[in-house]
Amino acid sequence: PVVEAHALDEGGGVAGIVGLGKAAELAVAEMEETTKKLTALRDKLIHGILESIPDSRLNGHPTDRLPGNCNISFSYIEGESLLLLLDALGIAASSGSACTSGSLDPSHVLMAIGLPHEIAHGSLRLTIDRENTEEQVDFILEKLPGLVQRLRDMSPVYPGKKA
């Protein structure tokens, strides 16, 4: 059967179009400042994690990435277990790439860039937006090393496991 399309309102939603235009104008005006803030927070987060957690690896290019994107893999842990511990602390994160969010399988994107299955399975994706603060990044950097070590201490394959 043929479906006829009808406008919701006469006039074509002018108010919505004007609102979208204003939102785009504001976004462009704030884009450079927002990008600088996100990049600084992202870089602090990445460097803090890599410096404080042995056997951690940045996934993707160190600078040619979205300003708020931090994707890191940790050897000898399961990403899903880390997500549960982070969630209990109020830290929102995901494992793998955005393409596989919600899946227990390792990210096909991480596998395609050459990560072994067990490393891709230990990945963590943290996304920073304009509402995040330096204090929140500091909180993650304070808590994450202990959580990763806790999971490694339970891992039967972790070579540094405490006897």
Predicted features along the sequence, with ranges:
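Conserved C-terminal alpha-helix-loop-beta "cap" of PLP-dependent enzymes
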Residues: 70-125
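PLP-dependent enzyme catalytic core of the Aspartate aminotransferase-like
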Residues: 101, 105-163
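Conserved core segment of the aminotransferase class I/II
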Residues: 1-35
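Predominant activation on well-ordered alpha-helical scaffold segments within soluble catalytic domains
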Residues: 15-25, 46, 50, 83, ...
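Conserved PLP-dependent catalytic core of the aminotransferase class-I/II
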Residues: 29-82
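Glycine-rich beta-alpha junction loops
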Residues: 24, 45, 74-76, 99-100, ...
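Generic structural signal for well-ordered, non-membrane alpha-helical segments
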Residues: 13-17, 31-42, 79, 102, ...
